[in-house]
């Protein structure tokens, strides 16, 4: 669509889609506090009804920033180092299970693995899927619940009527979604009963008063359950998708695989996350995979503020919905030459100006304070 009609395409009465990295940066980064998320984010929340929130779903910018400040210390380099040991424990389990099998469904195993990791890091309790080899009921219910989440976005008034409709699958999805949050709340309640010494360092500890171990003002067990669910879904799905695509590309490209193996062979036996961060080709392979296969390729709608918006000589009135998607921007030929070609080397040994342009246009998980 953008190849045919240009950087800006009108896709509805008051909606436009943009494929320009410059327009994206202005809307999502420079003026992210002015270009607010649309009501779409309220309707895709996994709870029944539009009144629940989470860090990704907040439309209110100040509310989102307050929660972000509480969580920011948990993603500092020091905190990430603390997570390494716990991650390695889950990785050892993964490797042991994989060695016992002749054939491995990598995507399925990665999904099990990442859910176990995030469950442990967020609430101090792994789901144990890698060991059991079975999908946890929580995951089954949530996957089925997407039927309800989709309806919530398009036919919200129908949601309360689902229990009375003669559609078994839809009813199962509805009640499954309720079980998802009942389970999340049970996990959080168990988590809150733990000693603060155990809770410190977990992803959910940012919501707690360090002196009492209880939820800070503005949070409750229910809101923490919603946040925990958000961490689990985002952390497990996006990472497992990316890991699978990386392996797939290495299989398709033996030359890339060989060069990456050579770089990895220089690591010491007890390497750390810091050591990995200093491997330029590994970084390039990951970036190039995320560029071609962003795990969240969908549009991210924003609303033009009262001051309006002008781009490439065209004025957009207040209330206009502007959307952009990583998939399209990552294929902008003005930034990425031969954009459909998997070429990790494009990130290495390039002039600083060109590298800066690529980094600004690299948005696999969106960009700016709101994502």
Listing of model-derived features with the role each one plays in the protein:
Residues 24-30, 34, 128, 327-341:
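Cytochrome P450 core scaffold surrounding the K-helix E-X-X-R motif
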Residues 77-81, 175, 194-196, 273-280, ...:
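Conserved, non-catalytic sequence blocks in retroelement Pol enzymes and Pol-derived host proteins
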Residues 53, 229, 234, 273-277, ...:
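Cytochrome P450 heme-thiolate "Cys pocket" and heme-binding signature region
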Residues 114, 238-263:
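Cytochrome P450 catalytic-core helices
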Residues 306, 324-353:
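Conserved cytochrome P450 K-helix/beta-meander segment immediately N-terminal to the heme-binding cysteine loop
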Residues 1-82, 115-116, 134-162:
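Cytochrome P450 substrate-recognition site 1
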Residues 37-48, 81-243:
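Cytochrome P450 heme-thiolate monooxygenase catalytic core
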Residues 84, 88, 134-144, 198-205, ...:
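Cytochrome P450 I-helix active-site segment
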């Amino acid at each position: 669509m953008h190849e045919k009609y240009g950087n800006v395409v009108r896709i509805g009465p008051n909606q436009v889609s943009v494929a320009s990295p410059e327009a994206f940066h202005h809307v999502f980064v420079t003026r992210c506090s002015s270009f607010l998320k649309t009501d779409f984010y309220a309707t895709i929340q996994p709870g029944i009804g539009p009144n629940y929130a989470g860090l990704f779903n907040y439309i209110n910018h100040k509310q989102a920033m307050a929660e972000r400040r509480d969580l920011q210390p948990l993603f500092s380099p020091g905190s990430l180092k603390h997570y390494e040991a716990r991650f390695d424990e889950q990785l050892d389990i993964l490797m042991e299970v994989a060695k016992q099998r002749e054939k491995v469904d990598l995507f399925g195993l990665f999904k099990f693995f990442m859910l176990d990791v995030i469950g442990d890091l967020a609430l101090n309790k792994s789901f144990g899927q890698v060991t059991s080899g079975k999908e946890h009921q929580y995951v089954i219910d949530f996957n089925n619940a997407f039927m309800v989440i989709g309806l919530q976005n398009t036919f919200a008034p129908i949601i309360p009527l689902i229990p009375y409709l003669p559609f078994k699958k839809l009813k199962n999805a509805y009640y499954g979604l309720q079980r998802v949050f009942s389970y999340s709340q049970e996990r959080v309640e168990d988590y809150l009963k733990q000693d603060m010494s155990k809770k410190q360092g977990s992803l959910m500890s940012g919501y707690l008063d360090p002196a009492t171990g209880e939820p800070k003002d503005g949070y409750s067990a229910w809101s923490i359950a919603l946040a925990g669910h958000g961490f689990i879904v985002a952390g497990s799905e996006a990472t497992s998708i990316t890991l699978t695509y990386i392996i797939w590309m290495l299989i398709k490209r033996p030359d890339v695989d060989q060069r990456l193996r050579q770089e990895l062979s220089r690591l010491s036996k007890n390497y750390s996350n810091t050591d990995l961060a200093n491997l330029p080709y590994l970084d390039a392979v990951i970036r190039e995979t995320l560029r071609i296969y962003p795990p969240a390729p969908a549009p991210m709608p924003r609303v033009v503020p009262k001051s309006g918006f002008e781009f490439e000589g065209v004025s957009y009135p207040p209330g206009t919905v502007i959307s952009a998607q990583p998939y399209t921007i990552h294929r902008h030929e003005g930034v990425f030459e031969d954009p459909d070609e998997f070429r990790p080397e494009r990130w290495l040994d390039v002039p600083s100006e060109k590298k800066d342009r690529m980094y600004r246009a690299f948005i696999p998980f969106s960009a700016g304070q709101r994502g």
